[in-house]
From Swiss-Prot:
Residues 40-68 bind DNA. InterPro entries: ERT1_acuK_gluconeogen_tf, PAS, PAS-like_dom_sf, PAS_13, Zn2-C6_fun-type_DNA-bd_sf, Zn2Cys6_DnaBD. The lineage of its organism: Eukaryota, Fungi, Dikarya, Ascomycota, Saccharomycotina. Residues 14-23 have a biased composition (Polar residues). The keyword 4Fe-4S does not apply. It is found in: Cytoplasm; Nucleus. This is Transcription activator of gluconeogenesis ERT1. Its main location: cytoplasm. The keyword Chloroplast does not apply. Residues 408-480 form the PAS domain. Belongs to the ERT1/acuK family.
Amino acid sequence: MCTPDENDYKTSTDPDTSANTNHTLEKKKRKKRKNTNVACVNCSRLHVSCEAKRPCLRCISKGLTATCVDAPRKKSKYLAGIPNRELPMNIQPDLPPRKIMIPIYNNSSNSSLNVNNMGEQQKFTSPQHIVHKAKFLSNAADSEYSILSNIIYQDTLSNKIPIDILYSNTNSTSNSTIGNSSNNSPTGTNTSPEETEMEKIRQLYSEQRANIPPHPYPSSNQNVYSILLGPNSAKIVASQVNLFANHFPLVPVDSADNSLNFKRLLPRDPSEKSSQINWDSSINQYYLNSETVTFPELAIPLKRRKNHLVSVSLESCSPDAANIKSNVEWEHSLRYSTPMEIYTSINAPFSHTPGFHHLLVYLKHRFNQQDLVKMCRSIAEFRPIFIACSVTLTEEDMIFMEQCYQRTLLEYVKFIAQIGTPTCIWRRNGQISYVNEEFEILCGWTREELLNKMTFIVEIMDDESVRDYFKTLSKVAYRDFRGSEKMKVCRLLSPIKGKIIHCCCMWTLKRDVSGLPLMILGNFMPILN
């Protein structure tokens, strides 16, 4: 008896199996659709696949070419209340890249409008980036948002930095920064189009400045910056450049006798060594003041007595020292000493845009790429909060904000004068706005040296403290609305090169009526042990 072979079972298949085989072959013959990031309105409504080109094939076959447009994306939560016409426009891949135009800032009273009207143009190669267009009712708010976008989307993002550099453990020198190639590249045939555009802007800016009345020079009365701005201090002072509109960082100076005699109008006599430092041996106490002896000058005496309990006392000053010190020319600081002057004289908002711009340039020249990326990310957290708080503010609102700042600063100055804690106040862009006499004694920098020019709080901090500064800033200003934070260790740089003051710093944040960070008060106490 014959048994059926196994091949008989393979060949004698039923009709259902052959139909499935033919269906599989037809699927393989079909062309695969290319995925697209954005579907059209018609395909999105029916939840079917779409194409990148417009009109798509499905809309052509259905006769819906007139309505075949990209479906709108879902808005983020902080953009929910903004009309579509005021939202950022997506850059299409076929659009040519746009050039970068960085405005040159002038800190005169009518310069804020000139800066705000220049607009922002950015050069992006990725279609996911956005081009900023005016979306605020205030020119000051729109200008500040533009510079925040410039900080975030400039060549400081991680996707613009090679992976091996970003995540390498090698410590780059502080001088190797992003964007320094422009300083080293020779002029002539190697000049980039952006540099050519910047040169045209500088020429136009110089022509406009010719019609502006001369601005009083900060150092005309006291030549405080003749040696404190680095090797080119004398040239900077001789050029009469506007130190409020242009930023030159403070640079510590070598001191042979570890004193501040190099910048005092009446320096101490070098022959009288320790007799000038008031010292009470019975109670182990030093007496300091802002005129003759400051805390950085006690570094060597305190080191000799590190095994003993030592106290520091401030000598009583004249009653005139408690008077409110205001200066009309210091737009970033306290300008008036009465509330009536504040409300009647301030008729323009304070522009934070130049401060953010020069802060970024300063950080580029001081830190490496990896540190700079982390700092820019901390600044980037401020952008959505700024949109939510400022989108409905008008120019009059921004003027009122500056009046609130000056009025609040006036009250704080009266209160700070009654206490002995070293205190420094700075704006949200890091620009120092006020210091008391105790802070002068603690760090060695005088009030005129810090406020007679554009000075940032990070200038007088060491590198590690600057890194902690931006971490603390993102906590106290953008995340935690309690308004207070503590830096356990903050190292302040003194005018004496190599002399660092170890402090503990307590932050207190003051917000304006819209919720934006208005000012930051820093209370510094020295760590003696």
